C-alpha cells in the first residue's frame, strides 16, 4: 500500500505489476536521456559564440533526427503492447468473482459457489479499530487465494466506476450494461488496498477496496464458513 510522501509506485505484488514497474523504469530512463541531451544542446547554444549563418541545409542531421525518434518510439511501443496483451490474457482461472459498482459501495459474487455474495461498505471513522486505516477499511473484505489466476468480472448498477488496486496493477472501468474482465494473481499473502478511480458522485472517495490474499487452504475454510 502507499505511505506518506511516497514518490514511486507501490510495491509490485503481481506479475503484471512487476512488468508495469519495469516498463515505467524503462520509459523514464529514455525520457531522462532525451531531456539531458536537450538541456546540453540548449546550454551549448547559450554559451558558444560560434554560428553557422551560411548553412542552408544538413541532410545528415535531418536524417538522424527523423530516424532516431522513430527508433525511440518503437523501443517504447513494443514493451507497451506486450504488457497490454498480457493484461488481457486469462488462462484457466480457478475462480471467478463478479464485482458490481454502486453509489457508493461494491458488491461481490463468487460465481463458482452458491449463495456466496456480499456488499462491501467503507467503515466509518468512528467505528475504526486500532490499526485500521481511515477511508480504506471495509466491513467485508474480498478474500482470494494467492498464487492462482482469478478472473474478475466488473460492471456497474448505476454510473461509471473504476475498480482499482495499484499494488496488483489493476484498474478496470465498471460500466453500466457492459461486463469488463481482469486477472488477479498475487505473489504473496496480505491485505491490498484500492479505491474507486472514476469520479462517480459526492461519495466517490468513500468506495475503498480491500483484497485479502491468503493460501488456498485458508480460502477453502473461509468459503466453507460463508456458505
Swiss-Prot record:
InterPro entries: CcO_II (IPR045187), CcO_II-like_C (IPR002429), CcO_II_C (IPR034210), Copper_CuA (IPR001505), Cupredoxin (IPR008972), Cyt_c_oxidase_su2 (IPR014222), Cyt_c_oxidase_su2_TM_dom (IPR011759), Cyt_c_oxidase_su2_TM_sf (IPR036257). The keyword Membrane applies. It is found in: Mitochondrion inner membrane. Its EC number is 7.1.1.9. SUPFAM superfamilies: Cupredoxins, Cytochrome c oxidase subunit II-like, transmembrane region. Pfam families: COX2, COX2_TM. Gene3D superfamilies: 1.10.287.90, Cupredoxins - blue copper proteins (2.60.40.420). The modification Phosphotyrosine is found at residue 218. GO terms for biological process: ATP synthesis coupled electron transport. The keyword Translocase applies. Mg(2+) binds at residue 198. It catalyses: 4 Fe(II)-[cytochrome c] + O2 + 8 H(+)(in) = 4 Fe(III)-[cytochrome c] + 2 H2O + 4 H(+)(out). Cu cation A2 binds at residues 196, 198, 200, 204. Binds a dinuclear copper A center per subunit. One of its GO terms (cellular component) is respiratory chain complex IV. Residues 1-14, 88-227 are mitochondrial intermembrane. Belongs to the cytochrome c oxidase subunit 2 family. PANTHER family: CYTOCHROME C OXIDASE SUBUNIT 2, CYTOCHROME C OXIDASE, SUBUNIT II. NCBIfam families: CoxB (TIGR02866). Component of the cytochrome c oxidase, the last enzyme in the mitochondrial electron transport chain which drives oxidative phosphorylation. The respiratory chain contains 3 multisubunit complexes succinate dehydrogenase (complex II, CII), ubiquinol-cytochrome c oxidoreductase (cytochrome b-c1 complex, complex III, CIII) and cytochrome c oxidase (complex IV, CIV), that cooperate to transfer electrons derived from NADH and succinate to molecular oxygen, creating an electrochemical gradient over the inner membrane that drives transmembrane transport and the ATP synthase. Component of the cytochrome c oxidase (complex IV, CIV), a multisubunit enzyme composed of 14 subunits. The complex is composed of a catalytic core of 3 subunits MT-CO1, MT-CO2 and MT-CO3, encoded in the mitochondrial DNA, and 11 supernumerary subunits COX4I, COX5A, COX5B, COX6A, COX6B, COX6C, COX7A, COX7B, COX7C, COX8 and NDUFA4, which are encoded in the nuclear genome. This is Cytochrome c oxidase subunit 2. It comes from Dacnomys millardi. The gene is MT-CO2.
Amino acid at each position: 500500500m502507499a505511505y506518506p510522501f511516497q514518490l514511486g509506485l507501490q510495491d509490485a505484488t503481481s506479475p503484471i505489476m512487476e512488468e508495469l514497474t519495469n516498463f515505467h523504469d524503462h520509459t523514464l530512463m529514455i525520457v531522462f536521456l532525451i531531456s539531458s541531451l536537450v538541456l546540453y544542446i540548449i546550454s551549448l547554444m547559450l554559451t558558444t559564440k560560434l554560428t553557422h549563418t551560411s548553412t542552408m541545409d544538413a541532410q545528415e542531421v535531418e536524417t538522424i533526427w527523423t530516424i532516431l525518434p522513430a527508433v525511440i518510439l518503437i523501443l517504447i511501443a513494443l514493451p507497451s503492447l506486450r504488457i497490454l496483451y498480457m493484461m488481457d490474457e486469462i488462462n484457466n482461472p480457478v475462480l471467478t468473482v463478479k464485482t458490481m459498482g454502486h453509489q457508493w459501495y461494491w458488491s461481490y459474487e463468487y460465481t463458482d459457489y452458491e449463495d456466496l455474495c456480499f456488499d462491501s461498505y467503507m467503515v466509518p471513522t468512528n467505528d475504526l479499530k486500532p490499526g485500521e486505516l481511515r477511508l480504506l477499511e471495509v466491513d467485508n473484505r474480498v478474500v482470494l487465494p494467492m498464487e492462482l489466476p482469478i478472473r474478475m468480472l466488473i460492471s456497474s448498477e448505476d454510473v461509471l466506476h473504476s475498480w482499482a488496486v495499484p499494488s496488483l496493477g489493476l484498474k478496470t472501468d465498471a460500466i453500466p450494461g457492459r461486463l469488463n474482465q481482469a486477472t488477479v494473481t498475487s505473489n504473496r499473502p496480505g491485505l491490498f488496498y484500492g479505491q474507486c478511480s472514476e469520479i462517480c458522485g459526492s461519495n466517490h472517495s468513500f468506495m475503498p477496496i480491500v483484497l485479502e490474499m491468503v493460501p488456498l487452504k485458508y480460502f477453502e475454510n473461509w468459503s466453507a464458513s460463508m456458505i
